[in-house]
Amino acid sequence: MTYSLTEKKRIRKDFATRSSILEVPYLLSLQKESFKEFLQKDKKPLERDPIGLHSAFSSVFPIHGVAGTADLEYVSYTMGQPEFDVKECKQRGVTYSSPLRVKMRLVLFDKDAPAGKRPVKDVKEQEVYLGDVPLMTENGTFVINGTERVIVTQLHRSPGVIFDSDKGKSHSSGKVLFNARIIPYRGSWLDFEFDHNDCVFVRIDRRRKLPVSIIFRAMGYSSEEILDTFFDHTHISYKKGAFVMQLVPSQLKGQTAAFDIADGDKVIIKAGKKITARNIKQLQEAKVDSVVVPEEYLLGKVLSSGITNEETGELVARSNEVIASDLIETMKSIKDLSFRILFIDDLENGSYISDTLNLDTTTSQLEAQIEIYRMMRPGEPPTKESSEALFNSLFFDEARYDLSSVGRMKLNRRLGRKDNEGSLVLENQDVVDVVKELLNIRNGLSTIDDIDTLGNRRIRAVGEMAENAFRVGLVRVERAVKERLNQAETDGLLPQDLINAKPVSAAIKEFFGSSQLSQFMDQVNPLSEVTHKRRVSALGPGGLTRERAGFEVRDVHPTHYGRVCPIETPEGPNIGLINTLAIYAKTNKYGFLETPYRKVIDGQVTEEVEYVSAIDEAQFVIAQASAAMDSDNKLLDELVTARHKNETILASSQDIDYMDVSPKQIVSVAASLIPFLEHDDANRALMGSNMQRQAVPTLRADKPLVGTGIEKTVAIDSGVTVIALRGGEIVSSDSARIVVRANQEEIAEGETGVDIYNLIKYQRSNQNTCINQKPIVKAGDVVSRGDVLADGPSTDLGELAIGQNMRIAFMPWNGYNFEDSILVSERVVQEDRYTTIHIEELTCLARDTKLGPEEVTSDIPNVGEAALSRLDESGIVYVGAEVKQGDILVGKVTPKGETQLTPEEKLLRAIFGEKASDVKDTSLRVSKGVEGTVIDVQVFTREGVKKDARALAIQEDELQKVRKDIDEQYKILEEDTIDRIQPMLIGQKLVDGTEITADFLASQDSSKWFGLNVADDALSSHLESLEKQLVAKKEELNGVFEEKKKKLTQGDDLQPGVSKMVKVYVAVKRRIQPGDKMAGRHGNKGVISRICPVEDMPYDETGRPVDICLNPLGVPSRMNVGQILETHLGLAAEGLGAKINAMLEQQADIKELKSFLHKIYNETQGQKVDFDSLTDAEIIELAGNLRKGVPMASPVFDGASEDEIKALLRLADLPESGQMKLYDGISGEEFDRPVTVGYMYYLKLNHLVDDKMHARSTGPYSLVTQQPLGGKAQFGGQRFGEMEVWALEAYGAAFTLQEMLTVKSDDLNGRTRMYKNIVDGNEYMEPGIPESFSVLRKEIRALGIDIELEQE
């Protein structure tokens, strides 16, 4: 295996028994691919596929004028360049988007020609601006109004047909009623349902129900056609004074004979006997094809067609009429009588449709359509045209109804049709087949569907949702255009006069800005970003609501396997509604989730990988990834555990169709980061997955000693690290930028040979954590494409590192770890292991007020020198200033209205000309509880307002940075070109005969080499072209600089009424302290109870104290044993690191070092490492990085076994039990039994006590009830609730209770009086009537009951 530059520096010992068949796919591909399809930016306008924006336009256009004299057609669209890049958009608080321009064609027809044959009179084409479309950043997010947002993928009910039942809950009898529902992508829902009398009804859009025959009549079927469609028939004729029935063998089986069936005199089947297959055979052998039936047999049978007396033309009986005794008499009198009855039995052919027809009062197509019109639009008078138009538009009009290709595929597959394609609207046959299938289910011939299977729920990603939002906007435009098209010709209008872009841009803005699925990105650490982008929500528009979702929808379903993670979902009301994609899952063209499997043929496992959706999976037999195989990949066991039809079975190895590609296939990214996940209880694993997302990036990231091997993938795919775009050599590397000279073969035509990576320094994330990048390469390193050049937040050498490795002991310590509390050593604080940086953004706006503009200035009235000492002459704080609560960051004064002056003030004014009292101090101050360093200031000034000195200085700084980048690029290009021409020139001759040598070139200025007069013409022209290239490049780079300069020097687009905006960023250092929440990766969370001096902590025989003491009682009841295994393996990892460290200290021989590494990596189970492929220097560097511990990877469901952990503990000369003697730091005595000690990866979560501590004296009150507000954000109080009142009542503390409910709460006068009394030093209170009592009185009066308070 070849290792990249960063991988060589630190190789993980991997315990996986199987090498990976399939690499983990790019984790953000779902988001990025979806949006790429929506825009189709890289395709030429006329070659675009009918998806995304193109599809939205094609479905709305062309728009036809009402009068038919003009059409507006869509031709194509183009996307412009965004005005600002992502970084500038975040700074300025604008949306990262690019303008959408659409080419429209207005076609005018000749008015005077007859309709339908109108010749084209004129065609006008024009590009129309249709608003800005937000663009996706490199990392799958959107910048909307300066903040990064994620559009969460939705899981919604797939269009198609679903058969279900009410599980016997609808009717009091408990009878199970079946129903069918045809769900389109957009349009009216069509429901069919049985009632308790076994009649079939139809509902449109969940309105009032109608008999199902009405919809067939409306589609043009007569009663007889309806009966023909749904029933089999039996022919009966009247001959020689008897009724003769034709026998149909298929109708006889299983029936009970109502009379003797005989061949001549020989009785074959006796009356009352059940007819068997043998009886039918006997009848066929005897060639009995008809039988005389007694008259009473016909009583109660139903006619399938009407009976007419041919002689008189009289209608004797209608179709669907029940045969009664008087009808039989009439029938006997008809000559040559022959008729059909419906074949109905109690087994498999119910009379449901026949019974339903009896309820139907309509007799013709028009009546049925009018009935439907009345139901859809009650109160409106129906006409023939309107009712016909409404019915056709409901299901048969492409503009109103769209089944979509998914819906058509699902419908056809469910109805057992061969073809998956077809019309995108409903057809008559579809409705008939759905009702037939519903009848089959009622007759017990078919089964209902499972609604919660992933075969009936599909994924709607960003692109599709944006397309729908866009289509909504276009439909709004369409209405306006239709009306304007009439006057298009008379007024000589152009396409842009017809189209108003506002509705479209409003729809897009609304979707990206305030849709339920457009969420503020969770950016605590790289994992939370990745997980947020891979989230799948069942909520949102067109989805479920929390209140209505039952248990079934939320539950884990067998089809989740490999598609949706069964572990990672939030606790609380959203449990099961918000899920996360499994690590290998992807969507197919229909939007259903698929998971990869290896193909298995006759027990031989192949390398071929196929993606299978939940719809197809049930029919296959699928083995686990852990099934035993020999070296030739043949399944060893005769019987293999497998999954088939959503059940786990034991199957013969010959019957296996597929096999999982990886053991971690079933879990999500976060869950696959938990080592020994297989030993944890699911509830705790859920908490572990969720808490990893809340881990705050520490000052120095520390890779986990025990990981799972997927850390690298997450760090790289999250986009927080810097990845080499092309291979090459590092020219320079410092904390702010890395410059790479690209390899010659990787430079494409017209590209520069230089890559400059500007690193992000101390930027604020959405959650106020710190985003900072640090280089991990040095000048002279040779890198390849895809190598990690710089670490981001929470990454260490290109691996995800969200916590710290802590030495942990599982033991109680003086009660300080009661109930999951955590005892932490002071050393952890001293070493800043959990110190985190949080960045607060504080904004100051200078507005134009009625009394004049506000002004940012350092001249603030009534403020001392000390308070202004940190401000520059513009009134803005210096970068680097240490500030604390209440300090001024931006000085600002606001004009205040003229007030009546006292005589003294008038005198002072007259003497000193004092105007200071005209303004009040509205400076931006440091908010409560914030103390830190100012790390950045940005000043934005409105166009036309003069920039202050500070703004100009910031602008100058920015320009210098850009200039430096551009100069560096040019310098490297120039050096490269000169390096290339030097060998060409040496040995050549000048025109005057001088030979060019290395010394000659050294004596010349290298920039003059191009102008050398060489004798060789070809070389001369080559030199000339190279010089031209350089000059052109220089001009291009200068153009880039001028563009940037223009952006920086122009005014900023601020919100209305704001003339200046100053943003100040304050970095706050938070050390760990009691009250902070910490957790491991196994759901083992707790709160720090005490920071204990190092000397008091328990220590081992070598005198090494532990860092953290955890309560051993936190393990058994929670069943998360993974943490114990992690602790043991962590101990081995650290012990091996200590041995390597000792070898390096003693400068051991490189062979000895290699052999020890070989023992660690290659003599236990897992993936082998070839140390011979590394140079000695690389081995030394690797060993140097392993001093603090050998990092291990224990992949989920394929991790280290107990024996392997023991073997590594032995190798590290540590006790195999993982337990050791500890001594009490306070008394020095040995504890009475060995204690489990080891290394666990521990995280500090974003629930810091500093953000939660809060106390109120007086503060804001609620408007209506006048009670104090609640919550820290409102500076609220603690609620004294119902139960607390009971407690005081129980104690009989009457006066305390009285003050709680009156003066401390909502007795207005009482509380002001008391406050005044306390100020006066008079501690006396007189309670009055609480305001909430008055509110109650008012509410009672609102009910019309007068209530008065009478004074006694």
From Swiss-Prot:
Gene3D superfamilies: 2.40.50.100, 2.40.50.150, 3.90.1100.10, DNA-directed RNA polymerase, beta subunit, external 1 domain, DNA-directed RNA polymerase, subunit 2, domain 6, RNA polymerase alpha subunit dimerisation domain, RNA polymerase Rpb2, domain 2. Its EC number is 2.7.7.6. GO terms for biological process: DNA-templated transcription. InterPro entries: DNA-dir_RNA_pol_bsu_ext_1_sf (IPR042107), DNA-dir_RNA_pol_bsu_external_1 (IPR019462), DNA-dir_RNA_pol_su2 (IPR015712), DNA-dir_RNAP_su2_dom (IPR007120), DNA-dir_RNAP_su2_hyb_sf (IPR037033), RNA_pol_bsu_bac (IPR010243), RNA_pol_bsu_CS (IPR007121), RNA_pol_bsu_protrusion (IPR007644). Belongs to the RNA polymerase beta chain family. SUPFAM superfamilies: beta and beta-prime subunits of DNA dependent RNA-polymerase (SSF64484). This is DNA-directed RNA polymerase subunit beta. It comes from Hydrogenovibrio crunogenus (strain DSM 25203 / XCL-2) (Thiomicrospira crunogena). The lineage of its organism: Bacteria, Pseudomonadati, Pseudomonadota, Gammaproteobacteria, Thiotrichales. HAMAP family: RNApol_bact_RpoB. Signal peptide: none annotated. The gene is rpoB. It catalyses: RNA(n) + a ribonucleoside 5'-triphosphate = RNA(n+1) + diphosphate. The RNAP catalytic core consists of 2 alpha, 1 beta, 1 beta' and 1 omega subunit. When a sigma factor is associated with the core the holoenzyme is formed, which can initiate transcription. DNA-dependent RNA polymerase catalyzes the transcription of DNA into RNA using the four ribonucleoside triphosphates as substrates. GO terms for molecular function: DNA binding; DNA-directed RNA polymerase activity; ribonucleoside binding. Keywords: DNA-directed RNA polymerase, Nucleotidyltransferase, Transcription, Transferase.
